């Protein structure tokens, strides 16, 4: 009851007739470029987060040490 291979081939043929192969090639390359750009921005964001996490941990440790020093002076 689903879409058969023949129906898909007919739809593909109609699309090629309407748009032409050159325009479809341009659309495909534009879509590929957009996907590559999206993947690159996602990987850049992950690298940024990976760099930021050690800095946050280091800042938390320094803050904890700074809070411990006044306690030592009081005691």
Curated annotation (Swiss-Prot):
Biological process per Gene Ontology, one example term: protein transport by the Tat complex
The intrachain disulfides are none
Q: Where is this region: Disordered?
A: 41-75
Q: What is its main location?
A: membrane
Q: Which GO terms describe its molecular function?
A: protein transmembrane transporter activity
Q: Which UniProt keywords apply?
A: Cell inner membrane, Cell membrane, Membrane, Protein transport, Translocation, Transmembrane, Transmembrane helix, Transport
InterPro entries associated with the record: TatA/B/E, TatA/E
Membrane topology according to the record: Single-pass membrane protein
Transmembrane intervals:
1-21
Q: Which domain of life is it from?
A: Bacteria
Compositional bias (Basic and acidic residues) at which positions? 66-75
Q: Which Pfam families match?
A: TatA_B_E
Q: What GO CC annotations are associated with the protein? A: TAT protein transport complex
Q: Where in the cell is it found?
A: Cell inner membrane
Question: Biased composition, Low complexity: where in the chain?
Answer: 56-65
Q: What's this protein's function? A: Part of the twin-arginine translocation (Tat) system that transports large folded proteins containing a characteristic twin-arginine motif in their signal peptide across membranes. TatA could form the protein-conducting channel of the Tat system.
How does this chain assemble? The Tat system comprises two distinct complexes: a TatABC complex, containing multiple copies of TatA, TatB and TatC subunits, and a separate TatA complex, containing only TatA subunits. Substrates initially bind to the TatABC complex, which probably triggers association of the separate TatA complex to form the active translocon.
State the family named in the UniProt similarity comment for this chain: Belongs to the TatA/E family.
The entry's protein name is: Sec-independent protein translocase protein TatA
Q: Which organism is it from?
A: Marinobacter nauticus (strain ATCC 700491 / DSM 11845 / VT8)
Gene that produces this protein:
tatA
């Amino acid at each position: 009851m689903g879409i058969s291979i023949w129906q898909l081939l007919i739809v593909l043929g109609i699309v090629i007739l309407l748009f032409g192969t050159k325009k479809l090639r341009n659309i495909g390359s534009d879509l590929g470029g957009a996907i590559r750009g999206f993947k690159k921005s996602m990987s850049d964001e992950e690298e940024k987060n990976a760099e930021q996490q050690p800095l946050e941990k280091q800042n938390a440790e320094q803050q904890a040490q700074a809070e411990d020093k006044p306690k030592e002076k009081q005691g």
